[in-house]
């Protein structure tokens, strides 16, 4: 993370020596939200918004969460309803369902967002092949609601079959 244009230029000059392509993003202060959808637009089996906690923080003003943080369990999920208003959660769900429909995503998807202190929602990315395990977002959701993980996976497969038969 660079904190000035000069610092960014210096960093870019160094990176250009090793990489032919670079992605530069503006850092947005806020909370990391993820919306996990399982199913299809006629019936979502799972439709849940989670927040990511890192070093006991929900709101980030300069931190960058890396893959290693997730792999080494330095992050935790919490239910969005424990920190965000119902209207913000419903807006995230609506944006996610609209994006899934627009992008023709089927069966499973995870959309990531940054939510500012003013409740502005910024779309970060769509993950059309999110990790499915009992320690991933889906596992957290199942544990929270005391759902049987195998039953949810069976519903996931049923959703795929129903879509295939419909298409």
Feature annotation, model-predicted:
Residues 85-167:
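ATP-dependent carboxylate activation and anion-phosphoryl transfer catalytic cores
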Residues 3-87, 122:
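Phosphate-binding site of ATP-dependent enzymes
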């Amino acid at each position: 993370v660079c904190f000035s244009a000069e610092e960014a230029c210096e960093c870019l000059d160094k990176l250009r020596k090793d990489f032919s392509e670079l992605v530069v993003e503006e850092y947005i202060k806020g909370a990391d939200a993820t919306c996990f959808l399982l199913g299809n637009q006629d019936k979502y089996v799972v439709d849940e918004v989670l927040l990511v906690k890192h070093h006991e923080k929900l709101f980030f003003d300069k931190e960058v969460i890396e893959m290693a943080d997730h792999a080494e369990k330095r992050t935790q999920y919490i239910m969005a309803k424990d920190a965000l208003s119902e209207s913000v959660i419903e807006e995230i769900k609506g944006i996610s369902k609209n994006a899934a429909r627009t992008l023709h995503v089927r069966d499973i998807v995870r959309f990531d967002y940054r939510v500012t202190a003013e409740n502005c929602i910024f779309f970060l990315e769509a993950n059309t092949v999110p990790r499915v395990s009992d320690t991933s977002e889906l596992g957290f959701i199942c544990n929270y609601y005391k759902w049987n993980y195998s039953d949810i996976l069976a519903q996931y497969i049923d959703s795929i079959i129903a879509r295939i038969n419909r298409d």
